[in-house]
């Protein structure tokens, strides 16, 4: 059955662009994805954001800072038969799903991602809603079979890696690049490049540029460090929603536009 779901995802959504964002935990990946999703929605696109992390906090900035119900949480409770149980539309208009994960110490988080993706496929959610973009926000510290799910079977068309110039962040990025290259099925996602989320460490852009060259991956976009990000998070919102006229909002909008152009 799983194979048929993979094949189905290879065929559907000719107009829909499915994009996976990977990166080390704590690097600002979810913040980046959430602001890109909000910026694309602001442009008039229908956007889905799918959180693929057992912490289930990818979409909190579309939900007033609160964690929503998850696919796996609904399944564990004996539900999950209707997407209304776990799909919600955020304050900025983004459609949000959190895959969720097992109870701590009781199972494999990667397997949980697989189970959640299968339920989303069984309910034909993307066919029903016809989004323009589906953004997968994926934990990139460990790229096991489950967390590599968006790279397989046509779930994602493109992959971006979010990193800073910090050593461990770049190490995680290198592992993600290896994972993308190791997946050789016909629907392998295209690695588009690195999004630098600056931490303002010494010679940061030079360090990322050198690492990117070594990995054979281009630097796609560089986001400056801004206190507006923390201020927006304190409000439980994206920068795009909380500070629409700010310089940081303009940066996220530029990134979203570049991603949309492909």
What residue spans do the PLM features occupy?
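Short, Lys/Arg-enriched N-terminal segments with co-localized hydrophobic residues
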Residues: 2-15
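C-terminal boundary of histidine-terminating zinc-finger modules
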Residues: 235-246
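Walker A/P-loop phosphate-binding motif and the immediately C-terminal alpha-helix
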Residues: 17-54
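Conserved catalytic-core segment of NTP-binding enzymes
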Residues: 122-129, 133, 138-222, 231
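Flexible beta-alpha connector loops of hexameric P-loop NTPases
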Residues: 101-111, 167
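N-terminal phosphate/diphosphate-binding loop that engages ATP/GTP or pyrophosphate donors
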Residues: 39-99
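Residue-level signature of catalytic and energy-coupling elements of molecular machines
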Residues: 25, 97, 116, 137, ...
